[in-house]
């Protein structure tokens, strides 16, 4: 059985206005992850991912590329332990 991994991923580049959040949420749901994704006012996209370690790592790899119109220039991952854990995967408002 895989260990549950919880991380916060911050993605910079051309990641807003290109469908990044919606595509991210679709991929996270397909991988059975819990968490959220949101735009930040500084132009980045931030996501909290929780789930089996192999699935979280696969999601992080996807986030390095993103959808076709995105251009990721930097991806930063930090441990995250956010409570309460959402029941599924949500697109949240900009912060």
From Swiss-Prot:
Positions of the Acylphosphatase-like domain: 6-93
Superkingdom of this protein's organism: Bacteria
PROSITE patterns, A to Z: ACYLPHOSPHATASE_2, ACYLPHOSPHATASE_3
Entry keywords, A to Z: Hydrolase
E.C. number(s) listed in UniProt: 3.6.1.7
Active site: 21, 39
Reaction(s) catalysed by this chain's protein: an acyl phosphate + H2O = a carboxylate + phosphate + H(+)
Pfam families noted in UniProt: Acylphosphatase
An example molecular function term from Gene Ontology annotations: acylphosphatase activity
Top enzyme class: hydrolase
Family: Belongs to the acylphosphatase family.
Protein name: Acylphosphatase 2
Gene: acyP2
């Amino acid at each position: 059985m895989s260990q549950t991994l919880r991380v916060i991923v911050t993605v910079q580049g051309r990641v807003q206005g290109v469908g990044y959040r919606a595509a991210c949420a679709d991929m996270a749901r397909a991988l059975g992850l819990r968490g959220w994704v949101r735009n930040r006012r500084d132009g980045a996209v931030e996501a909290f991912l929780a789930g089996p370690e192999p699935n979280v790592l696969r999601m992080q790899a996807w986030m390095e590329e993103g959808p076709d119109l995105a251009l990721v220039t930097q991806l930063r991952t930090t441990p995250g332990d956010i409570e309460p854990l959402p029941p599924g995967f949500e697109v949240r408002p900009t912060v």
